[in-house]
Amino acid sequence: MAAEDVVATGADPSELEGGGLLQEIFTSPLNLLLLGLCIFLLYKIVRGDQPGASGDNDDDEPPPLPRLKPRDFTPAELRRYDGVQDPRILMAINGKVFDVTKGRKFYGPEGPYGVFAGRDASRGLATFCLDKEALKDEYDDLSDLTPAQQETLNDWDSQFTFKYHHVGKLLKEGEEPTVYSDDEEPKDEAARKSD
């Protein structure tokens, strides 16, 4: 609005600017839509996605399974825990068996890493290969991995140790399983030798 228009209407310029902005927001359908969208997004950000706040239960998620007692597995015994035959999902990485059931969306039958469920995933994770053919059915000693692949595998091992419950170890053919007490946690080979 030009200065002559303001003088001609006899209105205070500060009143017109404030009223003009509010008037522009509330009279334009597009601006009302954008304002509503901004308020909705602000509400979602502040409120967040709080589970149980709406009162509905997520029927897709089964109730959590009780913690598995420590024990060792042969590759054949491990295969049962693929999320199909048994609701629990176990994976072996670097000789350690982890309960990854809480990561069902990733490691379950329909997940992107479902090929590793109930298997020794070490070779697949070390080589970034998601093909079932890359995994061995028997114990894999991983002796042919390059140093870079071994380092990648160690990174995966650390990540799984931090995130998932370590259940036991993967047994080589003819190896005797460790007998764990009910409250004992499985240890890796280095920790076991230092005791």
Curated annotation (Swiss-Prot):
Residues 44-195 are cytoplasmic. Disulfide bonds: none annotated. Heme binds at residue 113. Residues 2-24 are lumenal. GO terms for biological process: associative learning; axon guidance; heme biosynthetic process; memory; modification of synaptic structure; negative regulation of synapse organization; positive regulation of lipoprotein transport; positive regulation of protein localization to plasma membrane. The modification Phosphoserine is found at residues 54, 181. The chain crosses the membrane at residues 25-43. Gene3D superfamilies: Cytochrome b5-like heme/steroid binding domain (3.10.120.10). Its main location: membrane. Keywords: Endoplasmic reticulum, Glycoprotein, Iron, Lipid-binding, Membrane, Metal-binding, Microsome, Mitochondrion, Mitochondrion outer membrane, Phosphoprotein, Proteoglycan, Receptor, Secreted, Steroid-binding, Transmembrane, Transmembrane helix. Pfam families: Cyt-b5. It comes from the Eukaryota. O-glycosylated; contains chondroitin sulfate attached to Ser-54. Ser-54 is in the cytoplasmic domain but the glycosylated form was detected in urine, suggesting that the membrane-bound form is cleaved, allowing for production of a secreted form which is glycosylated. The modification Phosphothreonine is found at residue 74. Residues 51-72, 173-195 are annotated as: Disordered. One of its GO terms (molecular function) is metal ion binding. It is a single-pass membrane protein. Component of a progesterone-binding protein complex. Binds progesterone. Has many reported cellular functions (heme homeostasis, interaction with CYPs). Required for the maintenance of uterine histoarchitecture and normal female reproductive lifespan. Intracellular heme chaperone. Regulates heme synthesis via interactions with FECH and acts as a heme donor for at least some hemoproteins. May be implicated in 2,3,7,8-tetrachlorodibenzo-p-dioxin (TCDD) immunotoxicity. This is Membrane-associated progesterone receptor component 1. The lineage of its organism: Eukaryota, Metazoa, Chordata, Craniata, Vertebrata. The gene is Pgrmc1.
